[in-house]
Structures are given as C-alpha cells and as structure tokens.
C-alpha cells in the first residue's frame, strides 16, 4: 500500500494515548528472504515506532542474550527499545536470563511465566473470533490481571513517550450512498479489513449485514461481499440453509455482483469436505473444496488479466492464508489472476469468475488500488 497509505491508516485509527501494532511472524520476516520489505520491522521503521520484542525464553538461559543480540544487531536500526521474556520457568530461570541480558543495555519490561495459561483459545487460522469466544469478558479480565502482574507499565509508558508525532490527515469525503452492499457477517464469515468496508462506504455503498447461517435469504442489494472465515467449522449449518444458498445463486444469475475471498470462495464452490464429511455449498462454481493439514501462507504478487468486477487489468499485491484446496476444477477454467508470488487456486492461477462474480484466495486491501470504487461502479444501481 505504500508509506503514505500506511501512515494514514495508522493515524486514522490511533484514538488512544497508546496504540499497539501487533507484529506477525518473525520480526524481520517480510515479502521475501532478501530484504525487510513488508516485515514488522519495516512497518515500525515507516511509522518511526519503538518496538518491544517478545522472546521465547523456554529451555534457554545465557543463550537468550545471543538471540537478543542477533535481533538488535541484525539491522543497523533495529528500533528495539525493550524486551519481554516469555515462558519463564521459575525465579531462578528469570534470574539467569536477566544476568545474561545485563550488558546489552536493553530494558527488560516484562517476564511472563510459562504456566500463565492459554486464556484466549485458538484454532488453525489463529485466535478464535470474538463472536465464538465463551465468557469473553471474564477471560479479558484475567488477561488484564496477568498483564498487571507481569509487565512494568512505567517502562512501557516511558518508551511510548519517545514516539515522534505523525502528521495529521484530512477528513475523508464520502460520496452519497447509492449502491447497497450486503456483507456476510456471522460466525462463519468475519475476516474483513475494517478499512475495506469503510472504503466501500466512502465510494457510495449503503452497507447491510446478513448471516449466511441464520437468515433465510440475502437482503435486497446490488452487491454481495463474502469475506474469509471458518465455513468448514460451520459447514453443516451452512449446508442446511438451502434458502440462503438458493438466494445467493439466483442473485448471481440475475446479475447481482459478488466479491468473495477465501472462505467466501469456498462457500461458492459445490461442497466443502472437512473431517471426512462433505457439506453441500452454493455451487456457483463447478469445483469443490477440501480441507487439508497443509498451511498456505504468502504475500502474493500478481496481475489481474481481464476486465472484471473489481478492476481493469493491473498488477496487485495481496495475501493468502488457508488450510484448504480447490479440487475437481474443469480443465477449461479461465482464471482472472496470474501470480508471480503465491499459490492461488491452482498452479499460480487465482480468481474464479462467473456472471458478475469474482472469487479468489487472495485477500485484497481495497485502498491499494481503486477496488472499492470499481465494485460500486460495476454493481447495479
């Protein structure tokens, strides 16, 4: 998305005294193994943000200093301002690690014991969504108590006070709402960039939410947006809601535009096979989905090769993250995306298209191009 867009997003969403950016994967892991591009370190550098590094200290003592030294010296400006030691086994273990780190001049701002418990549950794509967490407030209260016991907030606040002020951004202008966009949102589909939904609103979308699990049919709309999620977990309930599946398929056949990503793509195939059970889905595309144990996780780089709902031909960046594969694809299938980096649906090809529908494994950030504008423009009014 570029530096300017990144700064704009951060400033727009920073409405607190302290804003926390969660890193993903390893600190220096990014687009490839050659540079820091698109890594957590790269983001921190662009935002001029200090970094608190969390290190797994289990099964180590003095060697933790070698790990910390490697992270701080790997790049000439690591931006690392403090360390949290995770999975500490005992007071003696903590003392050994502290002694090892004494000469690095990096503040230790927290020590978390290994038996502190996994309070927030996870599944194959990460933390279980808020909508599926039981007794969430009780769990958050426990997390809050643990944080108070384990972290030195005075040191954290001191680090945060050294942050450079970022530029102010102009309020965004919103076009008059003229196109209704129905967004699937429930326990089966809830992986959305909030900025994508805001981008649609900015371009003139009137947003309606619906549940593919509970509602009988889609609301009256010009466009349907089905994001990622866990359709395999809710496969039985999705398959049993025949009126919803029928309404989506008929809408597509009648010209309603549909944009679907990952879980949405799976929902539009004929079936999803999960734990040796096959669940019948919408069948808009003549292919099937099968869950696997193999993780697909990539930044993607590719090209949209044909005019479609979201774009004219152009290059794009995105990401893919799933444990599924699309099978029984007809040999004459034409794909919308050619990928230079990434797996896609099949052999670096991604993007099914039928009627005014686009469905792929790629998760797009709409403001990286005019995707939201094109969706509104190419949807009926």
Spans of features found by a protein language model:
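ATP-dependent carboxylate-amine ligase catalytic core
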Residues: 1-47, 51, 55-81, 91-95
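Internal gly/pro-rich beta-alpha loop/helix module
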Residues: 61-172
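Phosphate-binding active sites in nucleotide-utilizing proteins
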Residues: 177-253
